[in-house]
Amino acid sequence: MSFLQLFIVSIVQGFAELLPVSSSAHVIMAEKLMGLDPTSPELTMLLVMLHTGTMFAVIVYFWKSWRATYFSSAPAFRSNAWLLVAATALTGIVGFGLLKGITHFMRKTAPGFEIEHLFGNAKLMAGALAAAGVLIIVSSRQQARQHGTLSVGKAMVIGAVQGLCLPFRGFSRSGATISAGIAMGVPQRRAEEFSFALAVVLTPAVLVKEGWRFYQAVANGSLGHLEHGNSLAHLLAPSLLGMLLSFLAGLLALRWLSRWLEQGRWHFFGAYCLAASLVVLAVG
C-alpha cells in the first residue's frame, strides 16, 4: 500500500466512522477503487489501528461532557452504567443472533460461507445506506419534540438497533443509534453522547475479533510476505500513522456532527446516505 492509499483510507475511515454515513461502506468502496482487496488479511491490521484511532478521538472529544454526565456522582455513574449495560446486552443478543442466523442460513447452499463474504456486496451496502438515510430523515422530523429522558427501555431499543447494524456494511451505527434516540424523544445531545459511549464499549470487542482474524491469517500462512523475513513492524509502522490520521480526522468529524445536530441539519446526513447508495450501486 502506497502512502497516498494509506492517507486516503485513514482519512475516509476517520471521517466516515464518526459521521452517520457508514465508514465500512466508504472504506470498502475506496479500497476497491484503489485496487485493494477489502477482505484481505493484510488490511485487517490497518483497520484495527484505524478503529483504535477513532475510538481515542471519541474519548478525547466527549470526555469533558461524559465527566459531567456519567461521573458527576456515584448515583449518576450507576444509572448511566446500567443504561450502557442494558443497551450492550441487546446489541449482543440481536447482533450476534443475526450473524449466526445469516451464517447458518447461507451455509445451507454455500458450505464455505463466512459472514465476511457479504461485506463487499454492493447491493447490500446500497440497501443498507438507503435504509440508514430514510431512518435519519424520519428521525430529523422529531428534533423539535425532544422532551423525554433516556430510560432503560429506550436504551435497550437503541442497543437493539445497534445490533441490527453489525452484519450489514452501509447501515451506519452512529446514524441508526442517534436516530433511534431522537425518534423516541431523547434530547439530541444526550442521544449523541450515549451513542458514542456505546461505541467505546463495543469497539474493544470488535478490535479483539479483527485482531484474532489477523493472527489466524499469520498463523495459517495467508500473509506470505511475513514468512519471508519481514517482521510485523513492516505493517505496524504504516498502521500507526494511519491511526494518527484517523484520530485527527475523527475529531474534525465529531465537531462537524455536533454542529449539524445543534443547527437542525441532521436530515442532510440522511440525504447524503441516499445519494451514496446510488453511487455504490453504480460503482459496484
Tell me what each language-model feature is.
Residues 1-284:
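Multi-pass membrane proteins that catalyze or facilitate reactions on polyprenyl-/lipid-phosphate substrates
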